[in-house]
Structures are given as C-alpha cells and as structure tokens.
C-alpha cells in the first residue's frame, strides 16, 4: 500500500475542488434531496482568521435542521471579527476548526460519478446480482477499486465529517434514546456518545502512525533486502449492530472501517427504530457507494447470503453461527462480538460495601442489557448476608426515590426499559425461582432491579444469559472449586473478581479462560482503548478498540524488497558439501 501521508499539493487540491464543482453542477454523486454546503471566508490579514456562522454552514441532506458547529467556536469567531483580542490557545482552536472546515470544503465526493456508475452497471449486466443489496455491494466494490479510499487524507476527511455530524445531531440522538430505551441524557453521554467520540478522536489523532508501513529486519539469508508489513483494507465490509447499545456498537466499528480504507454496509437494529432513523440521517453525508445503511426489509432478509470481504457482527451466539454457516462458502473473515454468562466472584477478603456498589452499578447499567454485565454473582458463604444487605442499600440509593415523611421508597420512572416485549415475559419467568430480596416488579416494559438468592447451578436462570435487571446471588466456599466449575462451562466474555489476596488474583487471571475483565471492578475494562476487547469460544472471536479497531478492519501484508547488487548462491542447485555444511551451521542442525 502506497503511503499518502504527505500534505496535498496546491495543484492537487485545486484539481479536487474543480472536480467537485463540476460534479455539483450536474448533480453527480449527490443523493436526492442531499446537499452539503461549505463556504469558508478568508481574510488577507495574516495575523487573524475571521469566520462567522453564515460562512460555515453544513446542511445534512435529510436532517430537519442545518448542521451547526459548536456554539463556543461561533462566539469566539464572532469576537475575532469584531477585533477583540484572544489568547493563543483560543486562536489555535479557531485555526484548527478553520482547517477542518476547509478540509470539508475541499473534500471530495465519496462516491462514483455518473459516468462511472453507468460503466459499472454495463459491466455488471451479465452478472448474477439477484438482490437489491447485491447491486449496492457491486457498486461499493467498484468504488473501492478506484483506490480513493487508500488515500490517508481521504480517510481522515471522512472521519472528521463524521465527527461534525455526531455533534450536530446531539439533540436528536438523545431524544431518540429517550423514545426507544427510556435512556437519560447522562447515560447516553456516558455509555454511547462518550465512547464513540473517544474512539473517533483517538483514530483521527493516530491514523497516520497506524497506517504507516512497519519496517522489519531481515535475515542474512535474504541479504541485501528490506522487509515491510503493510496494512491492507479488506474492501466491502458489513457491520451488523444490536439494539442494546445501538449507536456505540454501530459507529465504533464504522470508524474502524473508514480508517482502514474500506467501504461499508451498515445494518442497525430494527428494535430501536428511532435511533436507527437518526443514524441513517446522520450518515447520509456519505454516498451510498461508500457507506450504505440497510433498513429495507427485502435487503435485510438475505443480507448474510451476500458475499462480503469482511464481517463485523455484534449479537447473539445463535445468530453468529447462522452467519458463519452462510459465509463459509465464501471463507469470509469476520469478528464476532457475542455474549454469555459473565460471572462475578466476591471473595471473603473483599471490600464488601465497595464491591456491592460496583457490582450493582455494572449489573443494572442499561437495565442489565449489557453484554459484559455481571450475569450472576458468586459470593463467599462467609460474607453472603453482608453483601446482600449492602447490594440492597445501593440499589435503593441508585434507582429509588426516598420519601422519608411517608416512610416509603418509590421506584424511579427513569430506569431503562426492556427493549423487546418478549424479554419482559422471559425475565418474569426467571424470577419465579429463588427468593426475591428486592425488586421483582414490572411496570410495562420496565422491570425493577431485582436481587435473587436461594439459587444453585441447576436453576433455570443459571442455564441462559439473563440480559436483564436480575442479579442472581450464589455462594461458594473454595475458589479452586469455582475454577474447576468454570472449566466445564462456556468461556465467558467477561469475568470480575473482588478480593485482595494476590495468589487468588493470579489464579483467576491465569487459570480461567475469559475474554476480558476487571479485578475489583466491573465493566470498566471496556472503556480503555489500549485494552483489546473481545470474546473467546462461544463469547466471540477477534477484538477491537483503539488501535485494534484499525487493525480489525485491515490485514497485514508482508513485502520483501530484494536488492540486485548481490545474489547468495547457496539456495541454488547444485548442492555441494560446502553448501550443506554452511546450511547446517546456519540453521543450527
């Protein structure tokens, strides 16, 4: 892969701008009712850049209102226009915003032009493209073959456009989450937007470094030579995301797909229709030949029968097996982010109150609809009663409003709802076994945080992933028995251990197979971009986050560049005793 990290030459920029003007005048590469307008005013004064809100407008094609930049930037720019003095830090921020907006102005249509589309259609006339989605994939593959996505500057531009869109659609995103999940703005920022923006900012800041070919030292046998490892995009990738974290689990993989130089087919969940609608509007800035959002029922029905170059799927193990079976004939590489029953172990030397607080938060986050949530808790029998009381205390503080005068507690209506109505009945049935220590009531699609005791490994709730606001509590006496038990069941996506003994911690880390986890906390390993996130066995394969998101959507390609001025004759026929002796010495035989 050719390195295109150097700055664009003025002549190349001019050429791109001229091409875009020609395309806009004829309506090429612009979807119906879509329009992106950017006008950046430039002043001749070298000491200042003056920009006003009127000069910086992006109009999303389907959005209800124009995309706006951050208000603070607009105010600073307005002050600059009036001649007020600024600090160097403010001037630097304005300059960065100006550069980004200029990039958006210059940058470039992301799809095929009209003639290329006609040519593509002609070439595929005789191809067996039996489905509407198959035609989209064919167009995307044609666009990928233009090599536009190989340009690092092109990729950076698209990531910056995406960042602006996310900021512009903030209110619509929060509103959609309230409708589909009953999720508050704070939770949307904490569990969705915050993670997306952190990943996006990291990728933009590090893409040039990540994409740069890595030099490797070569052996004496290949003297003289140079070795390189390049990161190649796969081509047309498919991203299928679930309903529990519909924005985060859609956009983070998409960031990797764009950064890696791929085109993308994105299938959000049908169970969160309002969020899916916002995602589609937000991503409408990209041409369908580059990023396509699947929402049509006809396309969804046969989506996994279509040949892709790479698949990133987040969902259930059952559906993952179906996908793997259908894609086996194509030998399609894929990453599967699944789930399972992630255990939480609370040992006798744990800080009981802090452990209960962190377990309760991790378990009932998003109403338990989190793939890495503690599915059940194994508490040492010596501290079981104290742990249960502490857990009940924290459930009350987090999710109930206290009415001291009336001497009662009232469940808060702001708790996240169960998305699928069928799951409400399933969860109610799971609560029929054991002792309900607190909760246990359903209010429509909202189920109160529930604590269950009096259970063992044979109960129904221990045979399937809970994926809801029910926390089963079991007891144990010997950690070694727990480790032996875990070797007999499916490997979990996550595991959490609370305790202080270093020997016990080392046993948990080394003798139990799990995707990832925490010592003395829950969930938080997911938030670290330097820690790879992924499952093992039934809980998934492959990983991502941070640099590994870029690596997930690219493949390593090895290149040996051999010199011409010297040629080692050892490898060529005929063999002599001297050659054999040298070879044995070299290979230490």
Indicate residue ranges for each PLM-predicted region.
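Structural signal for hydrophobic packing residues in well-ordered secondary-structure cores
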Residues: 148, 163-166, 170, 181, ...
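Rossmann-like NAD(P) dinucleotide-binding subdomain of oxidoreductase/dehydrogenase enzymes
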Residues: 219-354
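Residue-level signal for inorganic ion chemistry
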Residues: 155, 200, 261, 291, ...
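N-terminal Rossmann-like NAD(P)+-binding subdomain of aldehyde/semialdehyde dehydrogenases
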Residues: 92, 111-228
């Amino acid at each position: 892969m050719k390195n295109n990290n150097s700055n664009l030459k003025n002549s190349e920029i001019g050429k791109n701008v001229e091409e875009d003007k020609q395309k806009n005048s004829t309506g090429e590469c612009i979807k119906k009712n879509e329009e992106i307008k950017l006008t950046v005013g430039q002043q001749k004064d070298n000491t200042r850049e003056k920009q006003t809100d009127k000069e910086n407008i992006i109009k999303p094609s389907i959005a209800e209102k124009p995309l706006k930049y951050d208000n603070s930037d607009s105010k600073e720019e307005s002050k600059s226009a009036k001649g007020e003095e600024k600090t160097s830090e403010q001037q630097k921020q304005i300059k960065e915003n100006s550069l980004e907006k200029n990039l958006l102005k210059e940058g470039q249509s992301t799809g095929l032009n009209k003639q290329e589309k006609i040519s593509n259609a002609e070439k595929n006339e005789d191809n067996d493209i039996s489905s509407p989605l198959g035609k989209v994939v064919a167009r995307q593959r044609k666009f990928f073959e233009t090599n536009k996505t190989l340009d690092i500057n092109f990729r950076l531009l698209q990531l910056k456009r995406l960042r602006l869109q996310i900021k512009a659609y903030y209110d619509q995103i929060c509103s959609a989450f309230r409708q589909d999940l009953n999720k508050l703005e704070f939770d949307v920022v904490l569990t969705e937007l915050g993670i997306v923006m952190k990943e996006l900012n990291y990728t933009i800041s590090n893409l040039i470094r990540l994409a740069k070919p890595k030099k490797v030292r070569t052996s004496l046998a290949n003297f003289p030579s140079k070795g390189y490892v390049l990161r190649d995009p796969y081509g047309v990738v498919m991203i299928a995301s679930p309903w529990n974290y519909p924005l985060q689990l859609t956009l983070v993989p998409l960031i990797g797909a764009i950064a890696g130089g791929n085109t993308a087919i994105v299938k959000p969940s049908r169970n969160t229709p309002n969020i899916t609608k916002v995602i589609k509007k937000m991503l409408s800035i990209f041409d369908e030949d580059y990023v396509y959002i699947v929402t049509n029922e006809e396309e969804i029905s046969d989506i996994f029968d279509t040949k892709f170059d790479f698949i990133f799927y987040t969902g259930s193990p059952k559906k993952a097996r179906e996908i793997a079976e259908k894609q086996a004939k194509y030998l399609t590489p894929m990453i599967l982010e699944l789930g399972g029953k992630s255990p939480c172990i609370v040992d006798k030397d744990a800080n009981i109150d802090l452990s209960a607080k962190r377990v309760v938060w991790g378990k009932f986050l998003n109403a338990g609809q989190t793939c890495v949530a503690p599915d059940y808790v194994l508490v040492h029998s010596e501290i079981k009663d104290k742990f249960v009381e502490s857990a009940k205390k924290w459930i009350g503080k987090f999710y109930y409003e206290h009415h001291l005068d009336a001497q009662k507690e009232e469940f808060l209506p702001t708790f996240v709802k169960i998305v699928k109505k069928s799951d409400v009945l399933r969860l109610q049935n799971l609560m029929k076994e054991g002792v309900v220590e607190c909760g246990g009531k359903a209010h429509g699609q909202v189920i109160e945080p529930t604590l269950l005791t009096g259970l063992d490994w044979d109960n129904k709730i221990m045979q399937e992933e809970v994926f809801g606001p029910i926390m089963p509590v079991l007891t144990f006496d010997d950690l070694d028995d727990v480790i032996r038990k875990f070797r007999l069941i499916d490997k979990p996506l996550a595991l959490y251990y609370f305790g202080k003994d270093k020997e016990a911690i080392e046993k948990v880390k080394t003798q139990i197979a799990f995707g990832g986890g925490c010592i003395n906390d829950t969930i938080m390993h997911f938030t670290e971009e330097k820690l790879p996130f992924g499952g093992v066995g039934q809980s998934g394969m492959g990983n991502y986050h941070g640099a590994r998101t870029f690596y997930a959507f690219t493949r390593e390609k090895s290149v040996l560049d051999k010199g011409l001025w010297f040629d080692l004759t050892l490898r060529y026929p005929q063999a002599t005793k001297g050659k054999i002796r040298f070879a044995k010495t070299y290979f230490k035989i």
